[in-house]
Swiss-Prot record:
The RNAP catalytic core consists of 2 alpha, 1 beta, 1 beta' and 1 omega subunit. When a sigma factor is associated with the core the holoenzyme is formed, which can initiate transcription. InterPro entries: DNA-dir_RNA_pol_bsu_ext_1_sf (IPR042107), DNA-dir_RNA_pol_bsu_external_1 (IPR019462), DNA-dir_RNA_pol_su2 (IPR015712), DNA-dir_RNAP_su2_dom (IPR007120), DNA-dir_RNAP_su2_hyb_sf (IPR037033), RNA_pol_bsu_bac (IPR010243), RNA_pol_bsu_CS (IPR007121), RNA_pol_bsu_protrusion (IPR007644). It holds the Pfam family RNA_pol_Rpb2_45. One of its GO terms (biological process) is DNA-templated transcription. Its EC number is 2.7.7.6. NCBIfam families: PRK00405.1, rpoB. Coiled coil: none annotated. This is DNA-directed RNA polymerase subunit beta. It catalyses: RNA(n) + a ribonucleoside 5'-triphosphate = RNA(n+1) + diphosphate.
Length: 1385
């Protein structure tokens, strides 16, 4: 049981039966470890070469100039401390980053003009500032320009070699055309493919195809070399007057019908007749006997075969046949041999002919045919061909062509397979190259083509590109590394040019480097990359899920339009690696996934999942992590397989997975078993109780909607949970955990001070101050607020929860509320998933949430003079200024409504020409108040609430107003309070240690009044001396004296460090702010609004059951139970059967039982308060939790702690039912019986309006419901007049633009159908884009008249202009002007 401090306060009854061997890894580990590896900030050890940011520098440096007279080398790098901490960055809209210093070495050479020998002339080293490097916050996010962002990990195709075919789509015959592709991490793609005629082609970067032999020629092979690489050679020896003798391969004729008799060359005996099938038995006999070595083939049996080597006349050097040529012979009419290459060979007396071993059954002639098609015959012409394809239009030279070809695949700067790519290639092609070999080799290309030809011959399998062994994850660190490399390469070009143009002897490295490109690349990545996303901060779960997301989109990935079904589909290898449930609905389905709970990413970027080892059908606790490729070789049992107490499989045959198939296997064959049933789903899905009883589509919606739950005013952990709630609350960073054990020294709403007692290091003050976040705005405008859970004097262990955050309750995730629901229709108000709620929900603020909006206003310096933030605004009455202070900024705590002024601001207007009277007055009175207009920040329509925070930012050197000074004073006071508290605890600790050191020792001398050689005791220390005088006691023992001196010095050092830190922070507060150019002053105002639940708000359960509130019914009208309790929600029972999410019904029953047991405990506590007897409380706890849990968690507790634990569960006893291993139907029935209910889970309900009982019993229970972030207040919107579109002059659309309602085509038809001509005319003219008409209407409304006329809509004028743009002049004629009667005709 969880015996942490928070865990003791509320005990969950756990229904899981499977023992958890492995703790769930930290949920945001993916992000943190990846970026740590990139920056190597986790450990200050010397980073390994070739990895992270150091690897990037090493891949770009050293940089040489064009003449190689100077060289710029990379020595080391270091990250300095960031200027502002995370919180300061968020407040000031800055990026949380650390300055990157790089040490570079410039070596200048002297070159001897005669010999060309180099000698070092000068070496200079210097630290160069390379811009700021964004740092990750402890929660795995980045703060960029003041907002929290998350870099989503990307799934992409792993580098390596892939074999595939076109599934028969290319050719009409449906023939499979095989292809092979070598994908590097960066560099050119190389493809090999068959065409319909079985010729092998190659393509570079998907350009025009060339015969593959051209590529092989370019690699330096000749015809003979190519034939040698791809075919075995068979030798035919001439047997006088009989034919040819050749080696016999019995295996090859198994199951075939030979076209000619097979004749043993030695005996001349026919061993198999033509046309008869060769049986396997005969083949086995031939192999076992081994007597038949050679076959006799008739003279024409060799015709049509291909020569394996050039056959040359030794004397003259003339070539009879080249390698790959067909052996032919021609017959005359009489059937006599008259010519052909074969006749030439026989005539020349050649008796042995080496032939390619092509039999068109096991080995096809594809490479030989390709050779025949290829026009190139040597390396030069092949290189020229490749050059023409890659650089069309440029005249090729052999040198240029050779350089280009080398750069394409063999130059480590242009081509990188990456370690992953090399490992994958080695595995696929059975090679053994080192994984440091990052470019291609000749052998790699030859092997790829060989494997492709084997596929065509019917040996081997194609790869499945959706297999997770062929897809890998690029996390933050790697994405950042690639981006930084791009920046450095841009910089490299500039450096090279500068090295050539400056006087190299006099410059320092600093002068050569312009770090802007590198810094810009980083900024661009964090600001505008598709994978850098605004963090979803609605609640802690949405944060965690966002950080664990895997996207197949983004640069170098797929696009929504191009992705087919296969990529999006669930693949067997997703098991335990990617969640099969959680993915968005809509166009991104299957492209954006979530990491499974136990999964982790290995160093190669493949996702691994843990398994327990199984030896001889016994499960051990030894855990191994496996990637999808490694897992294919194993037989894996499921976590819920039946085991006995010793961990042995009970059943002889067990359900297992093996290489992607689900089969029954004997228990001895099993070598792995899942660690936990929840390892196959993601965090969000594992929060759904009874997930195993829900349909997958609804579970998907449930997972997605939990992420949209708004944090409520009062969090309430679910009665029916899954046991993983506390993990999410901790790992998300929403709840605060103690960094080390200690005792609570002070607690208030703003901070917690802990006096540490564990992990104390020498020179450590032993004080931990935790600042709580109070009513801060999240990215989604929800409210982040933390509340302490501890009291002064509590003892706390490391990692225990000391404060709750948004949507957490005693250290557990609490996204919604437990409410009493009834499944029944109620006057049609729950038609189509509508929800009926009781007025109690609104009255007691059950589903009330706080939302915080941020408004900002900037006073700029304009051409006409500076804008001013002031209370003195022209033409504004005192009533409108009631909430402003003397500086013109709204008070904290003011209640504001639409149109209220938040910050008063005036802007100078352009001078208007003056009248003579004005000139006179001006001459008399001097400078008149120049014209200003009111540009104050006002509350937008539809917004209202309370001001919770105001921040004022001033430019350096601009005088601060009263409000800014007040805010500054408060901030400095807060910092001083922190410093003082830390100092008090530091002094207490130090003096306690000092006291321990000197107590009972002899003092040689001391302050006034202490006699020499006094023994130090309590009276002396506490009575006579002040604490400060203790240091003046000189001890007899020199060793002790030295210890005390060291302690004193340590005390001074720590005090100085404290003061220095305080002064540094105060200086930051007092210093002006960096504001955008032209801005003198900026004010931010935060408005908080409480939103109650109201009709139109969207609610949901955890099982994908969602609906909109239709009506709030008075409590007395709601259906009520026999004891008079009215239900809170009425849901439609028809929403369950067709949706097949039965989990919600089980949850309802289980929740009902939990509530019933809670009420029993409540009654027992009442009894205790009356009688003082603990027995009924203990009995009630025993009934609720069962004897086992009671003995484990409650039996040994003292009275006070037991009462607290019991008091926390009076509303309902919380239970945990883990996914796929939770409570079964029998458990639910048992719980209902213990709570004193019937096992049907149904209750008698009475109609609140009539008081009569309903016709039959109704399912009533407690369900956990969430209020989603789709609030009617944010959506509803009305407009009278507002902004218009420039061209069409029609009102804009949407709430954000304060737009109008669209009156579309269909609506026009509706009015036409009703014959409402005038209404229609009004809609199309004055209410839309008849500019003159709408102005007149406005005027007449103001005057109180009701006559107007419609004119010509502006869109008609736009149409006329369009037509004129096509060269047709179109004019409108008035009826009066129409003299010729054109209109009448």
């Amino acid at each position: 049981m969880p015996q942490t401090y928070a865990g003791q306060k509320r005990i969950r009854k756990f229904y899981g039966k499977i023992r958890e061997v492995l703790e769930m890894p930290n949920l945001i580990e993916v992000q943190k470890s990846s970026y740590d590896l990139f920056l190597k900030s986790g450990d200050q050890l010397e980073p390994m070469d070739g990895e992270g940011i150091k690897g990037v520098f090493q891949s770009v440096f050293p940089i040489k100039d064009f003449n190689e007279t100077a060289i710029l080398e990379f020595v080391k790098y270091e990250l300095e401390t960031p200027k502002f901490d995370v919180e300061e960055c968020q407040q000031r809209d800055l990026t949380y980053a650390a300055p990157l210093k790089v040490t570079l070495r410039l070596i200048v050479f002297d070159i001897d003009e005669d010999t060309g020998a180099k000698s070092v002339k000068d070496i200079k080293e210097q630290d160069v500032f390379m811009g700021d490097m964004p740092l990750m916050t402890p929660n795995g996010t980045f703060v960029v320009n003041g907002t929290e962002r998350v870099i989503v990990s990307q799934m992409h195709r792993s580098p390596g070699v892939f074999f595939d075919h076109d599934k028969g789509k290319t050719h009409s015959s449906g023939k499979l055309l095989f292809a092979c592709r070598i994908i590097p991490y960066r560099g050119s793609w190389l493809d090999f493919e068959f065409d319909a005629k079985d010729i092998v082609f190659s393509r570079i970067d998907r350009r025009r195809k060339l015969p593959v032999t051209t590529l092989l020629y370019a690699l330096g092979l000749d015809q003979e070399g190519i034939m040698d690489a791809y075919y075995d050679t068979v030798t035919f020896k001439m047997v006088k007057n009989k034919g040819w003798s050749t080696k016999f391969f019995p295996e090859r004729v198994r199951g075939t019908r030979p076209t000619t008799d097979l004749v043993d060359a030695k005996t001349g005996e026919v061993i198999a007749e033509a046309g008869k099938k060769v049986t396997p038995r005969a083949v086995k006999k031939w192999i076992d006997e081994g007597s038949i070595e050679n076959l006799l083939v008739p003279f024409d049996g060799i015709v049509g075969r291909f020569a394996a080597k050039d056959i040359i006349n030794e004397e003259t050097g003339a070539i009879y046949v080249e390698a790959g040529d067909e052996l032919t012979w021609e017959l005359d009419k009489a059937g006599e041999v008259s010519g052909g290459t074969l006749k030439e060979l026989i005539d020349a007396g050649i008796t042995e002919i080496p032939v390619l071993d092509i039999d068109n059954v096991n080995v096809g002639p594809y490479m030989r045919n390709t050779l025949a098609v290829d026009k190139n015959l040597n390396r030069e012409s092949a290189l020229m061909d490749i050059y023409r394809v890659m650089r069309p239009g440029e005249p090729p030279t052999v040198e240029a062509a050779s350089n280009l070809f080398d750069q394409l695949f063999f130059d480590s700067e242009r081509y990188d397979l990456s370690a992953v790519g090399r490992v994958k290639m080695n595995m696929r092609l059975d090679l053994d190259a080192e994984d440091t070999m990052r470019t291609l080799r000749k052998e790699d290309i030859i092997s790829c083509i060989k494997a492709l030809v084997e596929l065509r011959d019917g040996r081997g399998d194609i790869d499945d590109i959706d297999h997770l062994g062929n897809r890998r994850v690029r996390s933050v660190g790697e994405l950042m590394e690639n981006q930084y490399r791009v920046g450095l390469l841009r910089m490299e070009r500039a450096i090279k040019e500068r090295m050539s143009s400056v006087e190299i002897d006099t410059v320092m490295p600093q002068d050569l480097i312009n770090a802007k490109p590198a810094a810009a690349a980083v900024r661009e990545f964090f600001g505008s990359s598709q994978l850098s996303q605004f963090m979803d901060q609605t609640n802690p779960l949405s944060e965690v899920t966002h950080k664990r997301r895997l996207s197949a989109l983004g640069p170098g990935g797929l696009t929504r339009e191009r992705a087919g079904f296969e990529v999006r589909d669930v693949h067997p290898t997703h098991y335990g690696r990617m969640c099969p449930i959680e993915t968005p609905e809509g166009p991104n389905i299957g492209l954006i996934n979530s990491l499974a709970t136990y999964a982790r990413v290995n160093k190669y970027g493949f996702i691994e999942t843990p398994y327990r080892r199984v030896n001889d059908a016994v499960v051990s606790d030894d855990v191994v992590y496996m990637s999808a490729t490694e897992e294919m070789r194993h037989t894996v049992a499921q976590a819920n397989a039946n085991l006995d107490d010793d961990g042995k499989f009970v059943n002889d045959m067990v359900n297992t997975r093996m290489s992607g198939e689900y089969t029954l296997n004997p228990r001895e064959a099993i070598d792995l078993i899942d660690v936990s049933p929840k390892q196959l789903v993601s965090v969000a899905a594992s929060l759904i109780p009874f997930l195993e009883n829900d349909d997958a589509n609804r579970a998907l919606m449930g997972s997605n909607m939990q992420r949209q739950a708004v944090p409520l005013l009062q969090a309430d952990a679910p009665f029916v949970g899954t046991g993983i709630e506390s993990v999410v609350a901790k790992d998300s960073g929403a709840a605060i955990m103690a960094k080390r054990g200690g005792v609570i020294d002070q607690v208030d709403a703003q901070r917690i001070v802990i006096r540490a007692t564990e992990d104390l290091e020498l020179g450590d003050a032993g004080v931990d101050i935790y600042r709580l976040r109070k009513f801060q705005r999240s990215n989604q405008n929800t409210c982040i607020n933390q509340r302490p859970l501890v009291k002064v004097g509590d003892k706390i262990g490391k990692g225990e929860v000391i404060a709750d955050g948004p949507s957490t309750d005693i250290g557990e995730l609490a996204l919604g509320k437990n409410v009493i629901v009834a499944f029944m229709p109620w006057n049609g108000y729950n038609y189509e998933d509508s929800i009926l709620i009781s007025e109690r929900i609104s009255r007691d603020d059950v589903f009330t949430s706080i939302h915080i909006e941020e408004f900002e206003v900037a006073a700029r310096d304009t051409k006409l003079g500076p804008e001013e933030i002031t209370r003195d605004i022209p033409n504004v009455g005192e009533e409108a200024l009631r909430n402003l202070d003397e500086a013109g900024i709204v008070y904290i705590g003011a209640e504001v409504e639409p149109g209220d002024i938040l910050v008063g601001k005036i802007t100078p207007k352009g001078e208007s020409p003056m009248t003579p009277e004005e000139k006179l007055l001006r001459a008399i009175f001097g400078e008149k108040a120049s014209d200003v207009r009111d540009t104050s920040l006002r509350v937008k329509p539809g917004d209202y609430g309370t001001i919770v925070e105001v921040r004022v930012f001033n430019r350096h050197g601009v005088e601060k107003d009263e409000r800014a000074l007040q805010i500054e004073r408060e901030e400095v006071e807060r910092l001083a309070r922190d410093r003082d508290d830390e100092l008090v605890i530091l002094e207490r600790n130090i003096y306690a240690r000092l006291r321990g050191m000197i107590m009972g020792k002899t003092a040689v001398k001391g302050p006034k009044g202490v006699k020499p050689n006094t023994v130090i005791d309590e009276d002396l220390l506490d009575g006579q001396l002040s604490r400060g005088q203790w240091w003046q006691l000189a001890l007899e023992d020199e060793k002790d004296a030295a210890h005390i001196e060291a302690l004193n010095q340590q005390f001074d050092t720590q005090k100085r460090a404290l003061d220095h830190r305080f002064e540094d922070k105060v200086e930051k507060v007092r210093r002006g702010d960096d504001l955008p150019p032209g801005v003198m002053k900026m004010v931010k105002v935060f408005i908080a609004v409480k939103r109650k639940l109201q009709p139109g708000d969207k609610m949901a359960g955890r099982h994908g059951n969602k609906g909109v509130i239709s009506k709030v019914v008075p409590m007395e009208d709601m259906p009520f139970l026999a004891d008079g309790t009215p239900v809170d929600f009425v849901l439609n029972p028809l929403g369950v059967p067709s949706r097949m999410n039965v989990g919600q019904i089980l949850e309802t029953h289980m929740g009902w039982a939990a509530r019933g047991m809670g009420l029993q405990i409540d009654e027992a506590l009442d009894e205790y308060r009356r009688s003082g007897d603990m027995t009924p409380v203990r009995d009630a706890l025993k009934i609720a939790y069962g004897d086992d849990v009671y003995d484990d968690a409650f039996a040994d507790r003292d009275e006070e702690s037991l009462l607290e634990a019991a008091g926390n569960v009076t509303k309902g006893v919380p239970i945990a039912t883990p996914v796929f291993d939770g409570a079964k139907e029998a458990d639910v029935n048992d719980a209902l019986i213990r709570a004193g209910f019937s096992t049907s889970g149904q209750s008698k309900l009475f109609d609140g309006r009539t008081g009569e009982q309903f016709a039959r019993e109704v399912t009533v229970g407690v369900k956990y419901l969430l209020k989603l972030h789709h609030l009617v207040d944010d959506k509803i919107h009305a407009r009278s007049t507002g902004p218009y579109s420039l061209v069409t002059q029609q009102p804009l659309g949407g709430k954000a633009q304060f737009g109008g309602q669209r009156f579309g085509e269909m609506e026009v038809w509706a009015l036409e159908a009703y014959g409402a001509a005038y209404t229609l005319q009004e809609m199309l003219t004055v209410k839309s884009d008849d500019v003159a008409g709408r102005t007149k209407v406005y005027e007449s409304i103001v005057k109180g008249e009701d006559n107007f006329e419609a004119g010509v809509p502006e869109s008609f004028n736009v149409l006329v202009k369009e037509v004129r743009g096509l060269g047709l002049n179109m004019e409108l004629l008035d009826a009066e002007d129409d003299e010729g009667g054109i209109a009448a005709e």
